[in-house]
Structures are given as C-alpha cells and as structure tokens.
C-alpha cells in the first residue's frame, strides 16, 4: 500500500435520538455522530410498528388541488 493516501481511521461515538450510545470506528473527521434511528429503536429490529399519520397530508393535498 502507498503511504500517506489512506484516511485516518478513528473512534466515533454514535448517539441516537432514543438515547442509545455506542462507539465504532470511522473515517469521519468528527469525534461524535448523531443519528435519528439505530438498531435499538428501528421498527425492523424491535418488531414494533410506528404509526405515521399521513391522513392529514392527504387531505391537505386534496384541498389544495381540488380533488375529492
């Protein structure tokens, strides 16, 4: 391998919005990374579904464009 062409590989602390924190290694130039979803709170891994209210968005779209 050539010397001096590879990025630095440092430890990064990842913090999720649910409060879960873990340490991994990355070429990211920052010591911390904030994410919205991790394996502790993602519906695929937890088996729980999150209800997303899209009915309001649909009604707003229909009113805006005159659809019934």
From Swiss-Prot:
Gene designation per UniProt: rpmE
The family line of this record is:
Belongs to the bacterial ribosomal protein bL31 family. Type A subfamily.
**The keyword RNA-binding is annotated on this UniProt entry:** yes
Keyword rRNA-binding carried by entry = yes
How does the record describe its quaternary structure?
A: Part of the 50S ribosomal subunit.
Highest rank taxon of the organism: Bacteria
Organism whose genome encodes this protein: Thiobacillus denitrificans (strain ATCC 25259 / T1)
Protein keywords: Metal-binding, Ribonucleoprotein, Ribosomal protein, RNA-binding, rRNA-binding, Zinc
Protein's GO biological process: translation
Name of this protein: Large ribosomal subunit protein bL31
Record function comment: Binds the 23S rRNA.
Q: Which GO terms describe its cellular component?
A: ribonucleoprotein complex; ribosome
One GO MF term on file is: structural constituent of ribosome
Q: Report the InterPro entries cross-referenced here.
A: Ribosomal_bL28/bL31-like_sf, Ribosomal_bL31, Ribosomal_bL31_A, Ribosomal_bL31_sf
